[in-house]
């Protein structure tokens, strides 16, 4: 993997930023705002297009070169001024060298007229690392998806249709690696019919190359020191160029659901509450069904969960999901109460054996220090506040979360109606609606249903074949002592222990693949105390565990729900028997791509199987579900979305023989 680093910036005497990497300015030092508005807003006719959006409409802007965010903020300001109240703006921007938060703050201070929007951007500009990073503003009415990396590596991973392009970035002479026919072909691939484009350069070869890619470009008068700029419209993919390959039918997008924007989400844990909020923010009226009295009563109900990134140095689909999901969750948490609902105290993963030391060294070589870095034993002790036997890998942006707080915050959206004490047992399809039944009682119906009830979704015939498994886990709660208050970071080895929340530490957690009894038991409490001793004998002593009688040990048990490949199961569901019949030829030749549309169960989706990573993966997967439902750009690389797709299991079964 290539380590993404921050932009290297020099500042002139007037405080304007200049890229040291490209020897170029980020914006005109004479008329930056006017130039941005003329080149990108005017040439894409955004004032009219924003004003004419329907109440529930949206416009999607794509950009090359996020830079200081000036173009985004100007577009947001115009959208806020003239778009209907319920309309939405989605902005997707690629950036190879993101500014540090301090540099971004300094640059945006130059534009006081944008301060209301800049302040919100800065509040959310945390944990912005490599890959797809989703930021949300104004209760989700405006979203920004940053693709952190090289444009020619990131844009091919994007799945979506762009209505208007801001072709920015440093000048072609300064950044020739970006301004290429390959880039223009990606813009064409991603363009919606009649998409528009504006760019500050009027260079002849850029105009000709964009024309060759399927755009119709023309020179128009510029502004300031720009005599001319380019504007254009996407006409069609060039006839003499092979079309980019379409998604395989089993991973293609289902047809959007028209008509009533009502959805049912079954299960009010992390996955269900996140999905409900993501849909509600898009104007859907959501019924959130929960068999208990309130959200977050099962695995999402632990007093503390750890925001910990178990990454791979090799850029696997799971690692990409974790990195994007971590950033998304961290930004959500900024809106909750620190110290009660969550805390960014950092997470220290101890180097407890040689294999772990080797793994940590590989990760430290693969990722930036701002995400993770190695600490020797004295530094680890200083960071954690307790005596330790080893150093480890420190995640400064990690910490602990009170999962119920996140669930309740998400479920509190005005468009969400919680239906508690309802056990959904059966789904029936009647007149383009999904009916949810409990015994012989109809609970509710809607054109869209999302199954988010962990392994319980296997009781529905439509999802019974999904290979979900339960793993019992038990945590132990220990009262804080005056001495244990020294613990300043979450510390992990085979188990974990968190700094106290409301006078209690959480430690755990057991893994039991066989038990189905959720009654907390002494054996697992003692096992958790053993994990604590492996972390720190000093902390064990500080917590006075030797003086605790068995009946004083408190905790709770719940089932983690995971899949065989440890990736969550997220996306639209197909009719399994029809799927096996439609693609039976794959059993003889896995290279075939039958020209047969996938037999979707229209309007039925799943968000489950997050295992012990739900805090990191479930919220972003709620956004992924909403993108599938509303035909939006996916918030993850297409390859990662396919790796999480429910159809992957039936597909593997066919290829390996028989679909079983």
Curated annotation (Swiss-Prot):
- Output the Gene Ontology cellular-component terms: cytoplasm
Highest taxon of the source? Answer: Bacteria
Cofactor(s) needed for function:
FAD
Predominant cellular place of this UniProt entry's protein: cytoplasm
Q: What is its EC number?
A: 2.1.1.61, 1.5.-.-
Recite the UniProt keywords alphabetically.
Cytoplasm, FAD, Flavoprotein, Methyltransferase, Multifunctional enzyme, Oxidoreductase, S-adenosyl-L-methionine, Transferase, tRNA processing
Compartments (UniProt record)? Cytoplasm
| Chain spans, region tRNA (mnm(5)s(2)U34)-methyltransferase | 1-235
Under PANTHER family, the record lists:
SARCOSINE DEHYDROGENASE-RELATED, TRNA 5-METHYLAMINOMETHYL-2-THIOURIDINE BIOSYNTHESIS BIFUNCTIONAL PROTEIN MNMC
Name this protein carries in UniProt: tRNA 5-methylaminomethyl-2-thiouridine biosynthesis bifunctional protein MnmC
Q: Which organism is it from?
A: Pseudomonas savastanoi pv. phaseolicola (strain 1448A / Race 6) (Pseudomonas syringae pv. phaseolicola (strain 1448A / Race 6))
């Amino acid at each position: 993997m290539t380590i993404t680093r921050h932009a290297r910036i020099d500042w002139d005497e007037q405080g304007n930023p200049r890229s040291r990497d490209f020897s170029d300015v980020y914006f005109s030092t004479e008329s930056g705002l006017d130039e941005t508005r003329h080149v990108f807003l005017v040439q894409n006719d955004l004032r009219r297009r924003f004003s004419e959006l329907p109440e529930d409409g949206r416009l999607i802007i794509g950009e090359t070169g996020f830079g200081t965010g000036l173009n985004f903020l100007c577009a947001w300001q115009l959208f806020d001024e003239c778009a209907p109240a319920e309309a939405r703006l989605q902005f997707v921007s690629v950036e190879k060298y993101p500014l540090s938060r301090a540099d971004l703050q300094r640059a945006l201070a130059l534009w006081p007229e944008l301060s209301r929007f800049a302040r919100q951007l800065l509040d959310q500009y945390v944990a912005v690392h490599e890959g797809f990073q989703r930021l949300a503003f104004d209760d989700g009415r405006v979203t920004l998806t940053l693709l952190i990396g090289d444009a020619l590596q990131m844009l091919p991973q994007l799945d979506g249709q762009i209505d208007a392009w801001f072709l920015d970035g440093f000048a072609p002479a300064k950044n020739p690696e970006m301004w290429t026919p390959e880039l223009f072909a990606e813009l064409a691939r991603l363009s919606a019919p009649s998409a528009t484009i504006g760019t500050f350069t009027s260079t002849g070869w850029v105009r000709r190359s964009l024309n060759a890619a399927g755009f119709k470009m023309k020179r128009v008068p510029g502004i300031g020191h720009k005599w001319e700029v380019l504007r254009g419209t996407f006409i069609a993919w060039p006839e003499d160029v092979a079309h980019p390959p379409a998604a395989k039918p089993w991973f293609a997008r289902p047809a959007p659901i028209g008509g009533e924007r009502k959805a049912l989400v079954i299960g009010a844990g992390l996955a269900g509450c996140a999905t409900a909020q993501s849909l509600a923010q898009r104007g859907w009226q959501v019924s959130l069904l929960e068999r208990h009295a309130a959200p977050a009563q099962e695995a999402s109900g632990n007093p503390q969960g750890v925001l910990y990134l178990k990454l791979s140095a090799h850029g696997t689909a799971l690692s990409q999901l974790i990195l994007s999901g971590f950033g998304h969750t961290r930004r959500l948490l900024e809106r909750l109460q620190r110290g009660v609902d969550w805390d960014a105290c950092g997470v220290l993963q101890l180097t407890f054996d040689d294999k772990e030391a080797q793994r940590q060294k590989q990760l430290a070589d693969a990722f930036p220090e701002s995400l993770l870095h190695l600490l020797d034993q004295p530094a680890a002790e200083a960071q954690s506040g307790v005596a330790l036997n080893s150093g480890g890998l420190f995640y400064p942006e990690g910490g602990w979360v009170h999962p119920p707080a996140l669930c309740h915050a998400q479920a509190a959206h005005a468009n969400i109606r919680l239906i508690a004490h309802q056990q959904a047992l059966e789904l029936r399809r009647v007149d383009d609606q999904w009916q949810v039944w409990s015994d012989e009682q109809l609970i509710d119906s809607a054109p869209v249903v999302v199954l988010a009830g962990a392994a319980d979704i296997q009781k529905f015939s439509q999802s019974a074949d999904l290979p979900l498994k339960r793993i019992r886990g038990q945590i132990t709660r220990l009262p804080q002592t005056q001495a244990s208050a020294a613990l300043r970071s979450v510390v992990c080895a085979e188990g974990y222990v968190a700094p106290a929340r409301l006078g209690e530490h959480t430690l755990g957690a057991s893994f039991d693949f066989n038990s189905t009894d959720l009654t907390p038991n002494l054996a697992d409490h003692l096992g958790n105390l053993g994990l604590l001793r492996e972390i720190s004998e000093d902390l064990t002593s500080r917590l006075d565990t030797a003086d605790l009688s068995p009946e004083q040990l408190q905790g709770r048990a719940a089932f983690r729900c995971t899949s065989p490949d440890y990736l969550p199961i997220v996306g639209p569901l197909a009719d399994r028997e029809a799927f096996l019949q439609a693609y039976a030829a794959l059993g003889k030749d896995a290279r075939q791509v039958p020209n047969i549309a996938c037999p979707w169960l229209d309007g039925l989706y799943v968000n489950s199987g997050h295992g012990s990573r739900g805090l990191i993966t479930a919220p972003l997967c709620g956004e992924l579900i909403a993108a599938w439902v509303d035909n939006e750009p996916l918030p993850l690389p297409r390859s990662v979305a396919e790796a999480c797709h429910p159809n992957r299991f039936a597909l593997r079964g066919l290829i390996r023989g028989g679909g079983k």
